Amino acid sequence: VNRKIIGCLVVLLSGIVAYGQKPPLLPEPVVAALAQETSGETAKRNLEYLARHHRMRGSRGFRAAAEHIAGQLRAYGLSDVRIEQFPADGKTMYGTQKARPAWDAEFAELWELRETASGWVPNVRLASWDAMPITLAQDSESADVTAEMVDVGSGTSERDYAGKDVRGKIVLASAQPGAVAQLAVERFGAAGIVSYAQNQPTAWSGDNDNLVRWGHLETFSDKPTFAFMVSLKHARALRERLARGEKIQLRAVVRAGRHPGFYDVVTATIPGADPRLGEEEIAFSCHLDHQRPGSNDNASGCVAILEVARTLSKLIAEGRLARPARTVRFIWPPEIEGTVVLLNARPD
């Protein structure tokens, strides 16, 4: 019996060792060439450029990022480099998805005012588009409003508004602006929203109360409005003052809005060498849109596949790597909706 057990262990361990010594998927010279050529520094330089832009769908910032990616692809020797454009007009249907119009902002500031003998004057700036674009919620519309702030808790249920007059005022809410606007603005007549919505309600939520989360409003709302985003730390201070009965007067100035534009989708290929298999494609895709500041979601992914494209193209051109049998395609769309647009407009 002992001999059988020992024999089984030998077979089992032999299998584990054999599995651990499994040869790599690629020949060692190819792996070495890829490791030598791939550059984290090059990827980081591209990331630094992308992260400078507030890259919302159809915006000037997104277009600048798309042109940078396309320019780099051409410089790296990729084929079929182009920026595909599809209407983002609020009307065109792509399958079951209605295109959202493009959105851009020129200016936005939120100030707390101080009362003086001559009237209310600016005292503390709470948010600035120029300093931090993420403080203006996406799909905000132009406004110039001076109004009192009212705390409405989450702002998503009728009980949040019980006994409170928010008409013509600016509400402070913990939920996303899009979830607050239906009651606060459309039903109860609030002039605008200040939100301190968190990225998610569990896990690390609240660990860093200085963070400002991206916010958004409903694109197709019948009653356009504006919203600013503030940190949890700032919101707590405002809530405490309001709870003590202090009057907080704000002035919000926004120059922003939706307009007909385009979904820009950057694409390029490394053509396959096989006449038959070359018609098939292996796709690398990362969404190019994101807010500024921020580099992880998903500028880091965008520059990662850009560096893959550069590395493969260079090694193939130098004869150090065989051209793949199938075509390799690289795609940089707006997140989700840009992919839906591309697949519906270009089903092939």
Predicted regions and their residues:
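Bacterial N-terminal signal peptides
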Residues: G7-G15
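Metal-dependent peptidase/peptidase-like ectodomains
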Residues: N123-S128, T225-F228, A235-R236, P333-D348
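Noncatalytic luminal/extracellular "stalk/propeptide" segments of secretory-pathway proteins
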Residues: K22-P23, E48, R52-R167
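Sec/Tat-exported extracytoplasmic proteins
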Residues: T38, T42, L47, A51-G61, ...
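Soluble metallo-hydrolase cores and metallopeptidase-like ectodomains found primarily
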Residues: A127-D160, G215-N296, E307, K314, ...
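Extracellular/luminal Protease-associated
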Residues: G20, R60, N123-F226, D297, ...
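Second-shell loop/turn segments in exported
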Residues: V30-E37, A51-R60, Q97-A99, L136-S140, ...
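Acidic/histidine-rich catalytic neighborhood of metal-dependent amide-processing enzymes
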Residues: F262-V265, H290-D348
